[in-house]
Amino acid sequence: CRIMTAALRGQGIRAVALDIGREEAIRLGKKYVHNDICFPAQIVIGEALAALESGKYDDKDVAIVMGKYVGDCRLTHYGALLRKALDDAGYDHIPILTNDDADSHNMHPGFKLNLASSVKIAFALPMIDVLEELLRKIRPYETVKGSADEAFDKALDLVIDGLEKSGVLGA
């Protein structure tokens, strides 16, 4: 989420990473996403709905950005699920932006992620995967509780800061 935000800001788009889903996001996700859909989809969609319901954002001046994966995972369909949830919740006017080149559901007319942003995301996501793998391996051996998470957060901040200031080479 923070990587996409950094890449979009580099493209001149005002972008904000949403808060991690809590009770309200879970409630909204369960309300607007069918129960047969995986819980992560319900949470992600609930986070977007909770942000809109919070009043922090003008729903006439906002778009929701969601990464898209092509494959067997239901993440492939999160954009379409989000579109349905937004429509059902009364936010049918809010566009959804994805990293998908083929806008088969007409969710983000007129928007294209530029090449520089695509490259930033393509290079940064594996960096985050490595950091997360290290975190999972190191956390059980930490001598000070929370120090592994703190180191992960600092490293992630450095990657994102470098990405925003200097592009791929800075990350």
Named regions from a protein language model:
Residues 1-171:
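An N-terminal assembly and electron-transfer interface module characteristic of large anaerobic redox
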